[in-house]
Amino acid sequence: MPTPLRASPASAAPSPLPQRILVVENSRTHARLIGEAIEQKLNLPVVYAATLAEARAALERHPDWFMVVTSLVLADGSHDEVVEFFLSRQLPTVVVSGVYDDGLREQVLRRQVVDYVLKNTPGSIDYLVWLVQRLERNRRIAALVVDDSRSARQHAAALLAMYGFRVIEAADGEAGLAMLDANPDIRLAIVDQEMPGMKGHEFTRRLRARHARDHLAIIGISGTSDGSLVPRFLKSGANDFLHKPFSREEFFCRVSQNIDQLELIGTLQDLATRDFLTGLPNRRHFLAECHALLPNTLGRQQSVTAAIIDIDHFKHINDTYGHEAGDVALKAVAQAIARHAGTQDLVARFGGEEFCALVPYLGESESVDYFESLRAQIEALEVDVGGPKLRMTVSIGVFRTRFPGQTLNHLLSEADRRLYLAKAGGRNRVVSGG
């Protein structure tokens, strides 16, 4: 089942990850082709250099570097000097070359270079953009390596770290399960077959029973020649399998393919459950989540507060400022609602200019204060629509109950009735009684 979509409260944001990319290329035309594709498709800042001297100056000007894309042919450095210059600064480095040379490729990949990419070939720019995006996203993903061989485990972990993953290691299946429980952000598991206590395919079976395919990718690995092992892993729930020894490039391609598929599934789930304009959960998903929350909360005689929030005079906003401005207004209100909501609150765009919230555990006066605060925050917004700042207000109907047996339809109907009273009473107000 997909993870419930709930808005989180505003909190101290984690330190932002470095975003700046250095493109080092003696051909300024090709440098621009690479850099502009990255900027346009990924919205990441790019700085250019044509020599190691220019690269050194750029690195000294800015502290927040994410990675480097560099040619091996520079006026002031040999192949080895170029690679060493960037790796010594612990920057993820992708090398681009105009010619394919097996010896040079092997020489480069023996270092900690992320990839060796041919330029001026069909699709090379698209591949570079994909690679940069993959490395950028990997920084937010944790990966688990489960292998009883310390050297093999550390080898796989080092490769994953090179590709930007946060890596967690375990020497056997039981330790691996404990690591999964302690680190819910793990999205990838690399699992060896031969381990004491629990074979890799059995660990995979137990892992898959806890984590669905839309949450966790599992790749089995083994050096055995047993032909039955691959289907055994796959039937136990693995997404893929690699035979040892494997090349760096094959490992990265398999890992990336599986993570790409996880993200595609997540995108499709978002399309099915989120409102495309505001990013809030949509009506259908909200109702499903509410039906799950309501019996548990009211069954323990805890309170639940339902609210319907409607933008006042929204038609006037569209008619006066245009429909694009109306969309901007909807997004601004949605963002205010999402910032205000707590981790257990359910919020959604219901349709048009109407939003809905279901908030557990509020006291009677707290429920009014909660939505009065939201109303005031929205009233204080000044929305940029390309001219005079847009100001707007909302009316909110609120209904609170703690009685078991109350249906969601009843809660929403009562909240809607109070919304009507708020509109009739002059708008820009919260009505909870009546």
Positions of predicted regions on the chain:
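Active-site-proximal structural segments of metal-dependent nucleotidyl cyclase/transferase enzymes
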Residues: 289-321, 337, 348, 367
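Conserved nucleotide-binding and Mg2+-coordinating catalytic segments in signaling enzymes
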Residues: 269-288, 309-323, 331
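Active-site-proximal alpha-helical element of nucleotidyl cyclase-like catalytic domains
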Residues: 325-346, 354
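A short pre-motif secondary-structure segment
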Residues: 346-349, 390
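Catalytic strand-loop-helix junctions within cyclic-nucleotide turnover domains
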Residues: 358-367, 386-389, 394-411
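Short regulatory alpha-helical coupling segments
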Residues: 269-270, 283-303, 334-342, 360
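Catalytic-core segments of nucleotide cyclases and related cyclic-nucleotide turnover enzymes
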Residues: 368, 401-434
